[in-house]
Amino acid sequence: MPFKRTVVAVVDDNLVILGALGRLLSAHGYDTELYASKDEFLDAVLTSEAICLIVDVHLGKECGIELALQLAKAGYTTPVIFMTADHHESVRIRALQAGAVAFLSKPFCANALLEALASLPPGRAIP
């Protein structure tokens, strides 16, 4: 049986955070696809092998929640984990209404992200 890669896509306009999440996920057995913008991800979405999308709520002038809604409208069912430094309850509510499987407030500990990935629905293989 061929080895099945477990790919997680991360979208964050902060390159330091993007790189840190890439290293964290790689250290825990995940392959990563790293995108610095909503448009960068959308350009690659048709070839993405991601089992989960981790997206920042605020992507510069773009909105990660709008990205998730756009993907859902197009029929994509990949689970989304939102992260943000915005601690307003209204942001968390909007993210959950957009279908988030998890919502992480920055700064968050690595275990919170890993636990969110481990709790993905069946069929979303975890290393």
Language-model segments: residues:
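C-terminal output helix
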Residues: S90, F108-A118
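Alpha4 helix (beta4-alpha4-beta5 surface) of REC/receiver domains from two-component response regulators
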Residues: E66, H87-A102
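Acidic catalytic/metal-coordinating carboxylates
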Residues: A36-S37, C63-E66
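The feature encodes the CheY-like receiver
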Residues: L18, G60, H88
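Two-component/phosphorelay signaling modules centered on CheY-like receiver
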Residues: L15-E33
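Active-site beta3 strand of CheY-like receiver
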Residues: S48-V55, L59
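Short amphipathic alpha-helix used as the core "switch/output" element in two-component signaling
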Residues: D43, I65-Y76
